[in-house]
Amino acid sequence: LEEELPLRIGPLREQWEARGPGFLRQIGVLTDERLLVEQAEVVVIHPALGGGGEAWLPANQVRIEGVLANPFPQLPEVVRLGWLISQLNLDLPALSENVHPDRLPRVAGIAMLPAALAAGREVELCQDSPELLAQAITNWRLAADAIVITQWWETYCEGRPPFAVALAALDKMLD
């Protein structure tokens, strides 16, 4: 695998360099500019699950499996990478003070999923639909209800409350 890592990293890096900055700008527009990290460490790991990843908020680090091709073509790995990176600043007290730290990683992942799909649509990486959200929940192994997330996201987009308020509301909806 060590010899294969450059082959596995290359396409993802190229896609990120081409679309990642615009993707993150859209995340800031859709949610809160404070979510944009100045830098993040991306660790590419062995593809044990055939596509997977995790955001580790305290270290501003994401781990993503190095797959040779998108396991789910309608959900490109570069969107997964952007989704993971978009979670990293959600541990800022101004954004998450009303969410218990033990629940924050789960709430962060769920909260940023519809934003990531919307950002992906804006930079022409994916579509943004309730069906794709449900597919992302399944394929990216999130324990969440697509209907609840869709309702939360639509309510957020209509009213645009501070993202910290929306995050706390999502936490209560998931309880």
Model-predicted regions and their roles:
Residues L142-D175:
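Hydrophobic, glycine-enriched assembly/anchoring segments
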Residues R8-R19, A69-P76, H100-A108:
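Conserved aromatic-histidine-acidic binding/catalytic patches
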Residues L1-N60, E122-E131:
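Auxiliary, metal-adjacent structural segments of Zn-dependent hydrolase domains
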Residues N89-T155:
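Post-HExxH zinc-binding segment in Zn-dependent metallohydrolases
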Residues A18-Q26, V78-G82, G109-M112:
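Well-ordered, non-membrane alpha-helical segments in soluble/globular domains
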Residues E38-V43, V62, G109-A116:
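Hydrophobic beta-strand segments of well-ordered beta-sheets in folded domains
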